[in-house]
Amino acid sequence: VKYLIGKTHLIHSLDRFELADELQKRAEKAAWTADCLLEVNIGSELTKSGFSLDEALAAYEKMRAYPNIRMRGLMAMLPISDDSQYLRSLCLCMRKIYDIIKNEDPNAAYLSMGMSGDWRLCVECGSNMIRLGTSLFGARKYPVQTNG
């Protein structure tokens, strides 16, 4: 968090209250307001962080109470699946939550959902921000791990 203060336009991954507490503390000290998206773990995946679909509305409202955090919407990453109906249902759940939030919060401008492999479906379901790193820059190259 200490490296983000004053250097970001939008934090896409506000995924827990402990992070919000630390962000609030540092942003207040720097007289800065952090624009953030609430991260939602729409597939309930153990390998991803974020609030569950059931927690998202209450978490968003609680985050709005931090004076130096301005909530701007929601962010989610779809699970990897060949079941397009399942993925569409997750996207539509996110859209419903976003619509509720947008009606209550004039700052809620973004539904960030969709990456290089699934952005078309996400846009069809209402996403207005996509992340296309792999399409633009190629697949990530991870260092080879050795046991020695």
Regions found by a protein language model. Give the residues of each.
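C-terminal helical cap(s) of enzyme catalytic domains, especially alpha/beta-barrels
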Residues: 120-148
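Conserved alpha/beta-domain cores
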Residues: 1-117, 125, 137
